[in-house]
Amino acid sequence: MAGNKRVRDAESEQDHAETETVVKDTATTGEVEGSFSDLKLSDGTMKAIGKMGFTQMTAVQTRTIPPLLAGKDVLGAAKTGSGKTLAFLIPAIEMLHSLKFKPRNGTGVIVITPTRELALQIFGVARELMEFHSQTFGIVIGGANRRQEADKLMKGVNILIATPGRLLDHLQNTKGFIFKNLKALVIDEADRILEIGFEDEMRQIIKILPNEDRQSMLFSATQTTKVEDLARISLRPGPLFINVDSEKDTSTADGLEQGYVVCESDKRFLLLFSFLKRNQKKKVIVFLSSCNSVKYYAELLNYIDLPVLELHGKQKQQKRTNTFFEFCNAERGILVCTDVAARGLDIPAVDWIIQFDPPDDPRDYIHRVGRTARGTKGKGKSLMFLTPTELGFLRYLKAAKVPLNEYEFPTNKIANVQAQLEKLIKSNYYLHQIAKDGYRSYLQAYASHSLKTVYQIDKLDLAKVAKSYGFPVPPKVNITIGASGKTPATKKRRTKD
């Protein structure tokens, strides 16, 4: 990457909520801390861990696995990419093994996670870990075939990975689903589960599940009041609070090189196109703020012979799953996506995270960049696009302990394909329509940002934004701004469609 680099320090304190009933055990390093062979695990688990290529534990595994093996409840705070999936699966599998769980005993462990992709990923890790065990495992997620799931549950699934909505559905409606013998409950990405609106479902699930002699573990990248409330109703009194991040200098992975570029709206796509062209041999994830923007830019880039994959919430589950695994297995390539891919997904060897549309807040930023530099020795780079009016976001990142460099790209290295882009959008009816949808959705997403002091829609230059979607003049679109549903006259754009 060319250009000057001005290092900006980003250090400040980050508070973690504490409750009186919680025992503190704080590790201050994310370095490798111990060996799996020290844990005295079953032969089947050790064989699987060896086959997966792991010998040393990460900090969160070192701190978490021994108390979980001893039967304690754990409330874990660890940044994304810290290795927590193994930290909760290994003790769960060991418990099922020691209790000699059979299919007829029903479900002994339930893992609840916010998204279908994350559930599939945890399921994949569980499948590898259980290769040499006799216990059964399964997954229930929205969008999958409910009847097939019910059939498997009735045959007996010892360890079940689930999203909240579908799990509640089966708990309430699937006769023959045996969960009375539940021994452990894992709630992963608890803050995200609550953020996306599953608070009521979680309360109902916890009410239905047996809690006598049940071990519980709750993991959350951030500790909020709602997470504390969920911990209070799901964990036994006096859980062990394990925080491997509280005294670290940064909130992001150590092997992550992070930067931002200041770019006017009309030059954003040209810079992105130039960057992707030069990095076609790398593995890159590009984040956008809306499904329609993803659809447009993915279609456009593929049309102009820059092959990309797309992942967003409007796709059918099978398509999302196929795309996710295709990108996982690729040595290089570009994935254009919404935040559906930002949380917890473990995609191997990602070189670059590009935040083309800005994240809503520092937490979203941290989870987006968490797709690279994963594990103990992970390396990766991230680049965030900001317009001159959005630079206030850097203050929030600094307060969240995110270290950033500023990158400058020489203008002579940026491909000037604006005229060709506008000509293409004008002549291709389909691209014209999805460009218009993308433009409208970008404005709508911008208007709904929570950091109103940073992302001010009145300060957007619509003519420049339109150019990044291939329009010489802003198209007429209709968006709703603000809680009142009223659209300021200066921003009102009516459309006939």
UniProtKB/Swiss-Prot annotation:
Comment, domains: The Q motif is unique to and characteristic of the DEAD box family of RNA helicases and controls ATP binding and hydrolysis.
Organism per entry: Kluyveromyces lactis (strain ATCC 8585 / CBS 2359 / DSM 70799 / NBRC 1267 / NRRL Y-1140 / WM37) (Yeast)
Catalytic activity annotation: ATP + H2O = ADP + phosphate + H(+)
Gene Ontology CC terms: nucleolus
Function, as annotated: ATP-dependent RNA helicase involved in 40S ribosomal subunit biogenesis. Required for the processing and cleavage of 35S pre-rRNA at sites A0, A1, and A2, leading to mature 18S rRNA.
Oligomeric form and interacting partners: Associates in the nucleolus with the 60S and pre-60S ribosomal subunits.
Highest taxon above the source species: Eukaryota
Gene transcribed to yield this protein: HAS1
Protein name: ATP-dependent RNA helicase HAS1
Record keyword rRNA processing present: yes
Record-level Gene Ontology MF annotations: ATP binding; ATP hydrolysis activity; RNA binding; RNA helicase activity
Motif (DEAD box): 188-191
Subcellular location(s) per record: Nucleus, Nucleolus
Domain Helicase ATP-binding: 65-241
Alphabetized UniProt keyword annotations: ATP-binding, Helicase, Hydrolase, Nucleotide-binding, Nucleus, Ribosome biogenesis, RNA-binding, rRNA processing
CDD domains according to UniProt: DEADc_DDX18, SF2_C_DEAD
Chief place where the protein resides: nucleus
Biological processes per GO annotation: rRNA processing
Motif window: Bipartite nuclear localization signal: 267-283
Residues covered by region (Disordered): 1-23
Pfam families referenced in this protein's UniProt entry, alphabetically: CTE_SPB4, DEAD, Helicase_C
EC number: 3.6.4.13
Record: residues binding ATP: 78-85
Motif Q motif mapped to chain: 34-62
EC supergroup of this enzyme: hydrolase
InterPro entries: DDX18/Has1_DEADc, DEAD/DEAH_box_helicase_dom, Helicase_ATP-bd, Helicase_C-like, P-loop_NTPase, RNA-helicase_DEAD-box_CS, RNA_helicase_DEAD_Q_motif, SPB4-like_CTE
Family under the similarity heading: Belongs to the DEAD box helicase family. DDX18/HAS1 subfamily.
